[in-house]
Amino acid sequence: MSQAALRLVDKDTMDRQKALEAAVSQIERAFGKGSIMKLGGKDQVVETEVVSTGSLGLDVALGIGGVPRGRIIEVYGPESSGKTTLALHIIAEAQKKGGTCAFVDAEHALDPSYARKLGVNLDELLISQPDAGEQALEIADTLVRSGAVDVLVVDSVAALVPRAELEGEMGDNHMGLHARLMSQALRKLTGSVSKSKTIVIFINQIRMKIGVMFGNPETTTGGNALKFYASVRMEIRRVGAIKDRDEVVGNQTRVKVVKNKLAPPFKVVDFDIMYGEGISKMGELIDLGVKANVVEKSGAWFSYNSTRIGQGRENAKTFLRENPAMAAEIEGAIRQNAGLISEALAGGPGDLDGTPVEE
């Protein structure tokens, strides 16, 4: 390349750089400093801040160690599957780190005594029981914009009834009103959620679509907007009962990460939800310990470092509950083998019964 051509290229590059600097300067004058910046700049935090879900297995399945801050999360599933329990565990974990949490109880069904058993500090929990969907979402928007709330739970999307529906007659048809309300609210929320680093968790119910011949007939309420705006979508289902002789003492629960913008999705994790206790940490330590080859299983016996910890899963759980030092040691070993466990949790792009889930 000739000297003249080199000078021409350099001049063109300099002109482009000057034009870019002028554009950035104009944007900053119009919208304030920091309105545009380079992603790899010294002031930019690349690491995603997270809050634990209260389930070691689910933290691993999410790929980043918990639910991400500054994002919208959707938790959905059938009735009595553990949706509110999971949300309350996230609140409890955030409060342990000194965070402020709020609960918008549109269903008017929150049980304070159960929340306390899960580790929620009720004295520090903000709660609202709004009358209409518009009121609930306005309260949520105000709390997010304050920048002072770490976790905000809306329970549930299905209970966010538009005011026009409340004030109308029982048989009136309000086609698409709920979906429009959610779409408008999410458009307003999404920017302030990112700036305030608030985790906004929408709990949702499922409905059956009429006339579906092939594929999964299940869908979530509130239209499609939440499916697009949510960074993480988790499907939670009760897959069995835990019995003590003839008495049912808990649920076997399965969670599938249906959508994940921060790590590979479709991971499936199983854990126990015990009545009056919530997610069984000791049960997870045993199950994940076996998957990570930290805990050895020989027949019905479980052992760790040649020490027998119990015959049968329930006895092993009791042993770990009585020996917190060993439980902490096993947890540390499991976290070190998180990559191995993550591969073991990998599922396929279907729902928990193997049929494709609608995105």
From Swiss-Prot:
Gene3D superfamilies: P-loop containing nucleotide triphosphate hydrolases (3.40.50.300). SUPFAM superfamilies: P-loop containing nucleoside triphosphate hydrolases, RecA protein, C-terminal domain. ATP binds at G77, P78, E79, S80, S81, G82, K83, T84. Pfam families: RecA (PF00154), RecA_C (PF21096). SMART domains: AAA (SM00382). It comes from the Bacteria. PANTHER family: MITOCHONDRIAL DNA REPAIR PROTEIN RECA HOMOLOG-RELATED, RECA. HAMAP family: RecA. This is Protein RecA. It comes from Paramagnetospirillum magneticum (strain ATCC 700264 / AMB-1). The lineage of its organism: Bacteria, Pseudomonadati, Pseudomonadota, Alphaproteobacteria, Rhodospirillales. The gene is recA.
